[in-house]
């Protein structure tokens, strides 16, 4: 049977695997030790190692093949596009229902004078020596128990998604009374109280409660500008997109404002946005925080100020009673972000007393649409020694803008999460998971996020990420009657 290979589910119609190729598997390597005066050696164990091998490939190159007769350079250029990845890719034989996570290594050698057919080899490097089923599986917990059937020949990692139907101080999942993973604190001797009650949490799916900003421009050098534009619902109904920009010079955009249900002395405010940076352009989007007198207290936002470069940065600025700005945070994207087409950016500002804490993180929205693997994370603290920035937070505004006369890098707000922080007695258990929060645990990536915020710092010291063995496993969820839990996995083979 003629077979071909798929790379990230893509194929080349004139490329085939040469007959007779032997698929390598079960790459166990034994460790032994020689002992003086003793025949043979002592068995010390075995391990599954990474390995590499060549796949022999054939190019069909005649007038009846796809696209007809092809030159040396035609073929080479297509092959380079097909195999040129810096990261792992899914490598699958079209006839098989499993794939490897593979890297490719050169060179590609093609005869200068093309023959019919054209033969060459590509080197495959497997740092992950397992095969994974193309089909994924999932099961939902019933009465806080969920079964997993791994039909493969090797243990396999899990993805756990748990939606809270009640507030909780922890989430725990255990396997057959052997292994467990926990985030939070379950110590029963500690008092449990919600010391961080939500004041206003909202995904941007409608404009209920928001007022359009028509004349009140935002006096922030990094994140402000002129208002007057409109917001429309965008990003599949999940974001505010600015439209109808004014003809004024400089930064022009759309703004919307609302009062909070209550003023917050100590608070945690998170703003998330999506940045469309496939094309170059200048843009900014931010959440602005005001005191009860309507004066700016703080601004948190994302900006790309270069119309011909993709060098975004996150800025946090505070304002005293007179309106004088104090920039306390300016974090430029790491180079790994420059080549991403669409990113989701989170920025969080926390104030407790005179200490301000900033935490920022991002997701590659194309490769990680479920937002399980945060990237480019950063944290910083800043002390308000003179206590110039202690006014309560009472009003918030969302603003997105472009620089008139230049191409716009579209940036849309996705959500605003405003939480009050109450005094917490020493040793008390905090409710780190609110009703409606989604806990995501990726056992293979070794990541845990709650409502898309990295929460590895909350992982219980004694717990660990675990795999499920080949065959049947029973998982238990705790606390009881608090979470709707789904477990996802793939069969894995040696």
Residue ranges and their predicted role:
Residues 1-200, 263, 276-297, 417-494:
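Extracellular/virion structural assembly segments
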Residues 269-271, 336-384, 447-450:
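Carbohydrate-binding surfaces in secreted/extracellular proteins
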Residues 158-162, 240, 269-271, 282-291, ...:
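Short, hydrophobic/proline-enriched secondary-structure or compact coil segments at domain edges
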Residues 369-412, 467:
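Flexible glycan-contacting loops in extracellular carbohydrate-active proteins
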Residues 296-306, 345-351, 394-399, 439-442:
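Broad, structure-driven detector of short, well-ordered beta-strand segments within folded domains
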Residues 315-346:
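Short, aromatic/His-centered strand-loop micro-motif at the edge of beta-sheets
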Residues 207-324, 409-412:
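Secretory/extracellular carbohydrate-interaction modules
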Residues 257-269, 335-343, 466-468:
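Extracellular/lumenal carbohydrate-interaction signature centered on repeated Trp-anchored short motifs
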């Amino acid at each position: 049977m003629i077979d071909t290979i798929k790379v990230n589910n893509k194929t080349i119609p004139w490329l085939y695997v040469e007959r007779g190729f032997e698929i390598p598997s079960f790459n166990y390597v034994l460790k032994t030790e020689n002992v003086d005066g003793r025949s043979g050696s002592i068995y010390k164990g075995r391990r599954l190692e990474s390995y590499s091998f060549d796949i022999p490939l054939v190019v069909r190159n005649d007038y009846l093949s796809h696209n007809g007769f092809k030159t040396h350079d035609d073929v080479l250029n297509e092959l380079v596009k097909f195999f040129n990845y810096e990261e792992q890719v899914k490598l699958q034989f079209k006839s098989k229902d499993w794939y490897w996570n593979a890297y490719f290594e050169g060179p590609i050698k093609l005869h200068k004078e093309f023959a019919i057919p054209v033969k060459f080899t590509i080197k495959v490097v497997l740092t992950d020596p397992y095969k994974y089923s193309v089909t994924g599986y999932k099961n939902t917990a019933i009465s806080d128990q969920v079964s997993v059937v791994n039909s493969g020949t090797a243990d396999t990692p899990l993805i756990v998604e748990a939606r809270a139907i009640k507030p909780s101080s922890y989430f725990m999942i255990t396997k057959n009374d052997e292994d467990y993973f926990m985030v939070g604190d379950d110590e029963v001797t500690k008092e449990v109280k919600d010391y961080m009650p939500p004041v206003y949490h909202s995904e941007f799916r409608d404009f209920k409660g928001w007022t359009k900003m028509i004349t009140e421009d935002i006096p922030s050098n990094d994140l402000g500008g002129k208002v007057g534009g409109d917001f429309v619902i965008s990003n599949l109904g999940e974001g505010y997109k600015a439209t109808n920009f004014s003809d004024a010079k400089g930064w022009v955009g759309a703004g919307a404002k609302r009062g909070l249900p209550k003023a917050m002395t100590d608070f945690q405010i998170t703003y998330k946005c999506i940045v469309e940076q496939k094309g170059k352009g200048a843009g900014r989007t931010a959440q602005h925080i005001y005191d009860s007198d309507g004066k700016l207290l703080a601004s948190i936002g994302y900006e790309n100020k270069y119309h011909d470069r993709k060098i975004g940065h996150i800025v946090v600025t505070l304002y005293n009673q007179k309106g004088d700005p104090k920039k306390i945070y300016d974090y430029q994207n790491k180079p790994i972000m420059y080549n991403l087409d669409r990113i989701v950016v989170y920025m969080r500002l926390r104030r407790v007393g005179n200490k301000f804490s900033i935490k920022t993180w991002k997701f590659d929205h194309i490769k990680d649409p479920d937002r399980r693997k945060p990237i480019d994370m950063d944290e910083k603290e800043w002390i308000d020694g003179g206590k110039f920035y202690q006014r309560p937070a009472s009003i918030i505004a969302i603003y997105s803008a472009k620089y008139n006369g230049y191409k716009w890098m579209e940036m849309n707000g996705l959500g605003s999460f405003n939480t009050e922080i109450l005094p917490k007695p020493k040793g008390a258990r905090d409710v780190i998971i609110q009703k409606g929060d989604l806990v995501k645990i990726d056992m293979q990536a070794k990541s845990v996020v709650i409502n898309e915020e990295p929460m590895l710092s909350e992982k219980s010291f004694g717990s660990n990420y675990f795999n499920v063995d080949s065959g049947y496993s029973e998982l238990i969820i705790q606390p009881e009657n608090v979470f709707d839990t789904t477990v996802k996995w793939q069969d894995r083979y040696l």
